[in-house]
């Protein structure tokens, strides 16, 4: 075994010694399994892979559920990208400066949200919208900055807020 290979193996061994040891996680070598029932954080969010749950250093991955007639909080993630895959249902996402743009996101759609871009998911449909959300922020909600709802979206104030993202 060459010097480079030995160095790589020793770095992996070192990393494995630092692997998370929480009792609610199963570890298999360098893999961590987070059972979805273990991560539920109220209505709307099943916490998955985060720095807290898996020791993730560069991403988080969660399942977001928005029941019919509900919305999220208008917010942005300071310095972190977001990628969303809609599994089922449909949402309208208000985004951009002043939340002036509206995009309908359907099951099977992917959506990319650049760092610092305000966004607001709304479910006006009749089924729960379910999406897988990945962010380049391993601390889950640490970088979330809530913004005011603009006047042109005042009708959304009557919709209950879902605890999410």
Specify the residue positions occupied by each region the protein language model found:
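Structural motif
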Residues: 90-92, 118, 128
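A short hydrophobic beta-strand segment most commonly corresponding to one strand
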Residues: 61-64, 83, 112, 127-145
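A short, N-terminal "cap"/entry segment at the start of jelly-roll beta-barrel domains
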Residues: 1-58, 73, 146-165
């Amino acid at each position: 075994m060459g010097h480079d290979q030995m160095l790589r193996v020793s770095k992996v061994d070192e990393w494995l010694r630092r692997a998370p040891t929480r009792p609610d996680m199963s570890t298999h070598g360098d893999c961590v399994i987070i059972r979805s029932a273990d991560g539920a954080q109220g209505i709307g969010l099943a916490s998955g892979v985060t720095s807290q749950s898996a020791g993730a250093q560069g991403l988080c991955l969660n399942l977001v559920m928005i029941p019919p007639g509900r919305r999220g909080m208008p917010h942005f993630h300071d310095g972190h990208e977001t990628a969303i895959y809609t599994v089922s249902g449909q949402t309208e996402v208000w985004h951009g400066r002043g939340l002036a743009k509206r995009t309908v996101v359907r099951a099977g759609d992917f959506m990319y949200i650049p760092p610092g871009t305000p966004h607001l998911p709304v479910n006006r449909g009749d089924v729960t919208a379910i999406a897988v959300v990945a962010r380049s922020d391993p601390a889950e909600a640490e970088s979330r900055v809530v913004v005011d709802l603009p006047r042109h979206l005042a009708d959304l104030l009557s919709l209950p807020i879902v605890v999410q993202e």
